[in-house]
Amino acid sequence: DALGNRNSLLHGGWDDWPWHGIALGAHVARLFSILLGATTVVFAYRTARLLAPRQRAAAVLAAALVAFTPQFLFISASVSNDNMVTAVCAAGVWLSVALACGRVTLRWEALAALGLLVGLAALSKLSGLLLGPFALLCLGLAAWRGRAQGQSWRLLVGGGAVILGVAASVAGWWYWRNWQLYVDPLGLSA
């Protein structure tokens, strides 16, 4: 049938409990995907708490909107790279907002963690590259907040270098490989 993208799996005796081989691998991968979906919901809640600290109901609503979106539930229960990029981006958005709001100290450890999240997002899926500009924008807001101490340029340049350096060390090899193979770092011409 040409309607929709219907994925199917043939079931047989090899799929019975106790799982082994491919069936075990598929169930482990689905469990990992479900954990990534739960991570996304947790970070949606935590980000909403940062943005509206006195309104716990808003954070619960934000988490519920994510958790009970039918397509999110469907994808979270399947094996897909979408689960990794949403979980990593949700954590990256939370950390970026926490830095911008001053809830997390602008230390190199936090900036390196944000760079790691940006790199993992960029490695998981092409749309994960968008976490990088958001993280740098939030770093800019944090630097602007620190301008009273005369640190704004140092924070912006140094922090940006840490974030981009760690992100490049995590994901840069993939884009370099694409450039070498396809003369296209995004691999869109392959």
Regions found by a protein language model. Give the residues of each.
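Interfacial juxtamembrane loops and adjacent helix segments
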Residues: 1-32, 190
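Transmembrane-helix signature of polytopic, membrane-embedded enzymes
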Residues: 2-17, 44-68
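Multi-pass, polyprenyl lipid-linked donor-dependent membrane glycosyltransferases
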Residues: 29-36, 64-68, 72-96, 108, ...
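Transmembrane-helix motifs of polytopic, lipid-linked glycan transferases
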Residues: 31-52, 91
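Short hydrophobic alpha-helices at membrane interfaces in multi-pass membrane enzymes
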Residues: 60, 95-119, 124, 153-154
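Transmembrane helices and adjacent periplasmic/lumenal helix-loop junctions
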Residues: 71, 112, 116-144, 168-176
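Perimembrane helix-loop-helix junctions
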Residues: 100-101, 131-165
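Membrane-lumen/periplasm interface segments of specific transmembrane helices
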Residues: 158-190
